[in-house]
């Protein structure tokens, strides 16, 4: 769900993000990514959350599908960056819908 900055999210996109954030471990991952301005490696996310590798892989895929994280690949290594633009668009849409 890569959307340009400033683009309004559809209702389906908002629901997908809400579903992703509604799971405790995914919410924890987003919080950890939000603490950093740069990318976190998969190992660093695992270390700071304590989530086992298979479960972490599943949650990272769900966050990627929701558009909340971007995967940065360097060779065989993957790092993750929080898509702050998507998160802000989500908040903006909630403000509009709930006003």
Segments from the language model and where they lie:
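Short beta-strand "wing" residues that participate in macromolecule-binding interfaces
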Residues: 71
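Short, hydrophobic-biased segments on the C-terminal half of alpha helices
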Residues: 60-61
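N-terminal helix-turn-helix DNA-binding core of bacterial DNA-binding proteins
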Residues: 12, 16-55, 74, 78-85
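Amphipathic alpha-helical dimerization/coiled-coil segments
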Residues: 1-14, 31-36, 83-99
